[in-house]
């Protein structure tokens, strides 16, 4: 059967706060087939950056992720503020989380992290000639460790499970052809 667009019959908020909106939708998948509830999570779009220093090492951040109860190495990034352009958000997040700036920026991709449940997209950028130029500007909810890693070391982190956020792994691999690795 050919897929078709679902029809929204009703929509109600389950949770709506500054972090996210969780909706319970009533959807008609095809005539006579209704799914109720179908949960949809709305969040702002995100940005992530593959930042390279002069020796082509990748700048990663390590932080604790409460829902999975794990410490993970990740790409620097975060939410795009209302009205903010993705590139500006990527530059801001890189500076805030790592104290780094970069002289050359290029767009890699914009992807849906989980189109089965979420409405947002993640925008990935490549930042070249990155260097740490200032102190971190962390929110009270953030505790972050930073480090530069070779491409082969990042592959090792993926294999041992310490760089395991799926969208970050995918974005890292999308950027690989541009890394000269």
How should these model regions be labeled?
Residues 1-15:
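Extended interaction-bearing regions that mediate binding to partners or small molecules
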Residues 169-181:
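Short, amphipathic C-terminal "tail helix"
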Residues 21-25, 71, 121-123, 145:
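Short beta-strand micro-motifs in enzyme catalytic cores
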Residues 43-70, 74:
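A glycine-rich, hydrophobic loop/mini-helix early in the fold
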